[in-house]
């Protein structure tokens, strides 16, 4: 009886081949990965069915392209908050799901989860990495926790108090320009352009103790920061350039590298100069000299910071934190100030009440400067700032990637691996959270009204362990700038209504134009 064997079939030599074994192992590994991904995807789809979703464009695109960085995109976000009330599921293509959240009840489990469980989503933030490094904005895990603990003293009120003089000086320079431009009665100004330069001027003095006179003449360093912000925004809108290799072949990618190098060289030079000063003076003499000038800048605080084990930050870490503060501190504050001036121009009765509050505070004072202790004496002006931050939050959304299942108060579960988009704008415009959300009403922030709602109904600085570490700095600067601006100028609306444009921060298409009239 004939016997069948591998050799008789001519298969034995191939079966013994190491290449075939390698191919089988590789194919098995790939098949296992595909099956695991398919199971996870199917399981997530089943678990996401409890979240409502708006109609898709089609099965392949999902909801991709339904929201643009435009006025219409913001209006669509408002409609989602109105329609769904708390949250919805959003598909980017056929595979990628995002849970968009619009309600304080469901924001809390995500933002207040430990930072290791819900780190920031890296898709967009990765564009900033070559510029900002592993600063607080982009770092994660133990490194983020260590840096957060070490940086917290930099924002203590004793450190912030001396910055008030810098805020006053910088806004005085901006106002001197406005007085010249309005010498014939009034001037039409793009608030973003003027206020961005002013905030960068203040930050450069607070971070580096360096005065570039950028409000009066061009500064290469300031121009590089503005260019980097614009290039990151532009790249975000070009999906093919998400790939680093392709991006750095383009003229924009090369400009980005040059601007990064310039910014890093400036920061490194300041750090090295301080490093040389410290050994020659000693820490005690250095602090004594700083005490006489009453100002410790951000670089000083970082150089002197130590963790629980007595370890200091490296020069690379210090550069990352300084560059992060320059990036995060100028655009967000400029956006907040520009929009509050817009609202007060549209509501002259609130503008006049703010002006009277500042006049009463400074009536017997020369020069007219706002000091740290004055900040608590401007309650109505503070209410106006907060209501503007509600309607026009500088950062319209923040994202988190769930590294484990997040259980919501109603029992629903956001599966591991899903990105949560906390819609700050949607929450602030949600009629289930804020009655008549489109009305500018500063009295929402009257102390007696605040206690009636969730603290997470108002989150312009985010919330939880990864909230904005510089919010006290930002609020202090906004109060000084707004108070002195209203003391010296009447702000009037422009004839064209701005169209909002969410980029890195909430801007206006073509600038936010207002008219200013000197009061004396």
From Swiss-Prot:
GO terms for cellular component: endoplasmic reticulum membrane. The keyword Lipid metabolism applies. One of its GO terms (biological process) is arachidonate metabolic process. The gene is CYP4F3. InterPro entries: Cyt_P450, Cyt_P450_CS, Cyt_P450_E_grp-I, Cyt_P450_sf, Cytochrome_P450_Monoox. Inhibited by carbon monoxide (CO). It comes from Homo sapiens (Human). A cytochrome P450 monooxygenase involved in the metabolism of various endogenous substrates, including fatty acids and their oxygenated derivatives (oxylipins). Mechanistically, uses molecular oxygen inserting one oxygen atom into a substrate, and reducing the second into a water molecule, with two electrons provided by NADPH via cytochrome P450 reductase (CPR; NADPH-ferrihemoprotein reductase). May play a role in inactivation of pro-inflammatory and anti-inflammatory oxylipins during the resolution of inflammation. The keyword Isomerase does not apply. Pathway: Lipid metabolism; arachidonate metabolism. Its EC number is 1.14.14.1, 1.14.14.79, 1.14.14.94. Signal peptide: none annotated. It is a single-pass membrane protein. Its cofactor is heme. This is Cytochrome P450 4F3. It is found in: Endoplasmic reticulum membrane; Microsome membrane.
């Amino acid at each position: 009886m004939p016997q069948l064997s591998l050799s008789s079939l001519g298969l034995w030599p191939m079966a013994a081949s190491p290449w075939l074994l390698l191919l089988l192992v590789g194919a098995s590994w790939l098949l296992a990965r595909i099956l695991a991904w398919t199971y996870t995807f199917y399981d997530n789809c089943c678990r996401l069915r409890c979240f409502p979703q708006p109609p898709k464009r089609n099965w392949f695109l999902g909801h991709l392209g339904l929201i643009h960085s435009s006025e219409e995109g913001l209006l669509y976000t408002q409609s989602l908050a109105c329609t769904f009330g708390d949250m919805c599921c959003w598909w980017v293509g056929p595979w990628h799901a995002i849970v968009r959240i619009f309600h304080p009840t469901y924001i809390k489990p995500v933002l207040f989860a430990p930072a290791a469980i819900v780190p920031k989503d890296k898709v967009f933030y990765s564009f900033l990495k070559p510029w900002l490094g592993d600063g607080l904005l982009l770092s994660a895990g133990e490194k983020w926790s260590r840096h957060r603990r070490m940086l917290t003293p930099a924002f203590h009120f004793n450190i912030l108090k001396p910055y008030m003089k810098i805020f006053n000086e910088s806004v005085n320079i901006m106002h001197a320009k406005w007085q010249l431009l309005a010498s014939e009665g009034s001037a039409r100004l793009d608030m973003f352009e003027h206020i961005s330069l002013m905030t960068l001027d203040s930050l450069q003095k607070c971070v580096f103790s360096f005065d570039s006179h950028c409000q009066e003449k061009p500064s290469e360093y300031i121009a590089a920061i503005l260019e980097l912000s614009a290039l990151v925004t532009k790249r975000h809108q070009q999906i093919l350039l998400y790939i680093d290799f392709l991006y750095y072949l383009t003229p924009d990618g090369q400009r980005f590298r040059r601007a990064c190098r310039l910014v890093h060289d400036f920061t490194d030079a300041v750090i090295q100069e301080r490093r040389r000063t410290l050994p020659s003076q000693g820490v005690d003499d250095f602090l004594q000299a700083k005490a006489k000038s009453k100002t410790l800048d951000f670089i000083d605080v970082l150089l002197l910071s130590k963790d629980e084990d007595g370890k200091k930050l490296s020069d690379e870490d210090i550069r990352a934190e300084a560059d992060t503060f320059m990036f995060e501190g100028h655009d967000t504050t400029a956006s907040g100030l520009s929009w509050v001036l817009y609202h007060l121009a549209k509501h002259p009765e609130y503008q006049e009440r703010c002006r009277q509050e500042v006049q009463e505070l400074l009536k017997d004072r020369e020069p007219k400067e706002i000091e740290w202790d004055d900040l608590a004496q401007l309650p109505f002006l503070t209410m106006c700032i907060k209501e503007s931050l509600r309607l026009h939050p500088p950062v319209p959304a923040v994202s988190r990637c769930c590294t484990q299942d997040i259980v919501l108060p109603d029992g629903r579960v956001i599966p591991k691996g899903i990105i949560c988009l906390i819609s700050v704008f949607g929450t602030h415009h949600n009629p289930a959270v804020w009655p008549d959300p489109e009305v500018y009403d500063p009295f929402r922030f009257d102390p007696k009204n605040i206690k009636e709602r969730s603290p997470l109904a108002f989150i312009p600085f985010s919330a939880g362990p990864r909230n904005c570490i510089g919010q006290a700095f930002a609020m202090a600067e906004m109060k000084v700038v707004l108070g002195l601006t209203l003391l010296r100028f009447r702000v009037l609306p422009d004839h064209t209504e701005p169209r909002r444009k969410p980029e890195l921060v909430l801007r206006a298409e073509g600038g936010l134009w207002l008219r200013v009239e000197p009061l004396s």
